[in-house]
Amino acid sequence: MIYTAIDTFYLTDEQLRDSPSRKDGIDEATETALRVYGCDLIQESGILLKLPQAVMATAQVLFHRFYCKKSFVRFSVKRVAASCVWLAGKLEESPRRSKHIIIVFHRMECRRENVPIEHLDVFSKKYSDLKHDLVRTERHLLKEMGFICHVEHPHKFISNYLATLEAPELTQEAWNLANDSLRTTLCVRFKSEVVACGVVYAAARRHGVPLPEDPPWWNVFDADEAGIQEVCRVLAHLYSLPKSQYIQVYKDNDSFTHRRTSDTNASKESPATTVASDKGTPVPSSSSQEKDALIKAGSDKVKEKGDDDGKTLPSEPNGKEGPAVNLKSEKSESNVDRSRERERDRSRGRDRDSRGRDSDRDSKGRDSDRERERDREADRDRQRRHHSKDRSSGYSDKEKSRHRSSRDRGDHYSSHSSRDKDRHRRQ
């Protein structure tokens, strides 16, 4: 039993030799080739999707962890690789849409199999099946991981180790070796510190850079010599392998370019063939024999129905079948009449519904028209009141001016009359 926890997903050599794929009859070479093939798919798809290297590294670690618990026979390496990329993008905060994942893996498979790249319609049944498989495989991944997807990569230790050892020229070489180590099972066998020390040692051996031996430099980084030697041995074995090729071990069709065999067979089968197979009649391969078998199966079915109907009806002692035939014809006519009446009722109900909808629409339209008329009348009343106020104010001003002029005139006349009176008095 493999228990999953944070930073404890590490297996022994015995557990790797007793993996589920080995139990299903897959040898070590085939399992190694399939692991490398799946990691190559993840790396190539990450480049096409423009993902950071951290996403591809996390996806490859999840890929190896999953196949430590499940077999290549029961889970497709292509579908699992696609789901690992999809899940790792979410974990590393660089998500990609499922549509882009499926299209990229579809194009990669067309290239690898040297077939024409065809357009993948996102509204087709094939695309919906691929998306369903992608989501289902992601659920399997999370279930087997126990929803613990924490991954620690050796890359973050490389820069610190080389800075301490004062060998910055080995950085790029060690980084490349760390990327290549993710295609092997080193990520599920050793801690990231040990893998980082191993790739630093391999890079130093390649470039001929001496490392301190007294005391041993790896003791400072919590590593041992045996682990470093094993890391170098696994990397050397990886570079000796040929280019990874796909090996068909999955039971069902896992192609991104073709449909499943079960779907194609189900689409090819007709109802008549299923009837013939249920009755036990073999279906020949040639077209003429198929037609004869289908016709025979249909006639047998009609005869059986007729026999069943005859058994249910009472038979006359003299063997007269006229009334039975009449009863059958009457029943069929009554059934036809009933079906016609049902259709009429349905059509009437539809007409009523449509009329009700139309009436509702008309009533709503009338209400809206009435509201508009009310608003218009209210606006007109406001305008009238405003005009009336303006007129009344104008009239008052005019009246005031008139009153003022009359007073002025009265004063003028009164002043003249008083002067005349004074003159007469003086005279």
Curated annotation (Swiss-Prot):
Keywords: Cell cycle, Cell division, Cyclin. It comes from the Eukaryota. GO terms for biological process: cell division; regulation of transcription by RNA polymerase II; response to salt stress. Residues 263-276 have a biased composition (Polar residues). SUPFAM superfamilies: Cyclin-like (SSF47954). It holds the Pfam family Cyclin_N. The keyword Cell division applies. Coiled coil: none annotated. PANTHER family: CYCLIN. This is Cyclin-L1-1. It comes from Oryza sativa subsp. japonica.
